[in-house]
Amino acid sequence: MSVDVDCVVIGAGVVGLAIARALAQSGREVLVAEATEAIGTGTSSRNSEVIHAGIYYPAGSLKARLCVRGKHLLYSYCAERGVPYKRLGKLIVATTTEQAAQLEGIAQRARANGVDDLQFISGEDAMRLEPALRCTAALSSPSTGIVDSHALMLSFQGDAENAGAQCVFHTPLVSGRVRPEGGFELQFGGDDAMTLSCNVLINSAGLHAPALARRIDGLPASNIPKDYLCKGSYFTLSGRAPFSRLIYPVPQHAGLGVHLTLDLGGQAKFGPDTEWVETEDYTLDPARADVFYEAVRSYWPALPDDALAPGYTGIRPKISGPHEPAADFVIAGPAAHGVPGLVNLFGIESPGLTSSLALAEETLARLNG
């Protein structure tokens, strides 16, 4: 059976690039096809850039296992490759007695996930660490950090290309089919429309992964989950923040609450909130600032008026809807759908960035398993 290229990875976000890197470094011929003009233009560049510890996810879930594994891989990779990062630590803060009671459950879940470095601290001790903070109790997570996600993606791209991979842009997948003799035939649009055949197809298209899977003739529709769009807005802080750590409220449904994160330059941003939407619209409504002021002042009461400026928005690629429990990552290989050579990645929301290197490992294992 002749093919034009051995492996095609759809999507040049952080996970797609990590997978392309792993495939290329294993000796395979790899083409990365990205619909837009550059790497990381979707969810990968519209997030909090946090290296998560692995605290919140159900024990035994892919999110829990791959976040913890990915965190260790990512810190080692960034240190080795000079990708900017900081292990700042995080405080999960309770501002009511009811929330304080929830901290023990969070700590128990973290321990079940292999995260054993959380520390309970009193409100007084938390406020000694961060004098601008107001809380009744907190959990300290010393292994939480931040990373320059674009530098990370550039490094993954460089690794992949150094191992022989090729990245092409403005190349959206229009349709595809499973070939009877094995492999895939793919039709791409864009400026240079083309048809390619390949042995291996990795669908790492983020928000568009379910829609892309539906374009592949021969893949059972029952193996493609319904997708939902959950928008999150961010506001940036004018001036310097009086915090040296990330500050997270006790999590609420569908997200981790309006948290305070810092970038590598020390600039603070707040978000994301949770807004279920029907279309992929990245417009930020400045009026949402009112809700942000209220949320942030629950733990930083001295937040000045007019201190928040509209930042950006992101959309979580969810495969569970409003009022449903959060879904786990789905990495659907041949064992799941019966199509040799195909892996679909669905619902790769947070902690996808943290988990990227571990997701690549898992994808190759499911491809070959």
Curated annotation (Swiss-Prot):
* Catalyzed reactions: (S)-2-hydroxyglutarate + A = 2-oxoglutarate + AH2
Q: What class of enzyme is it?
A: oxidoreductase
Q: What is its EC number?
A: 1.1.99.2
Q: Which cofactor does it need?
A: FAD
Listed A to Z, the keywords are:
FAD, Flavoprotein, Oxidoreductase
UniProt key word Iron: no
InterPro entries, A to Z: FAD-dep_OxRdtase, FAD/NAD-bd_sf
What GO molecular function terms would the record report? (S)-2-hydroxy-acid oxidase activity; 2-hydroxyglutarate dehydrogenase activity
Extract the Pfam families matched here: DAO
Q: Which family is it part of?
A: Belongs to the L2HGDH family.
Functional description taken from the UniProt entry: Catalyzes the dehydrogenation of L-2-hydroxyglutarate (L2HG or(S)-2-hydroxyglutarate) to 2-oxoglutarate (alpha-ketoglutarate). Also displays some oxidase activity in vitro on L-2-hydroxyglutarate with O2 as the electron acceptor, but this activity is most likely not physiological.
Q: What is this protein called?
A: L-2-hydroxyglutarate dehydrogenase
Name of the gene encoding the protein in the UniProt record:
lhgO
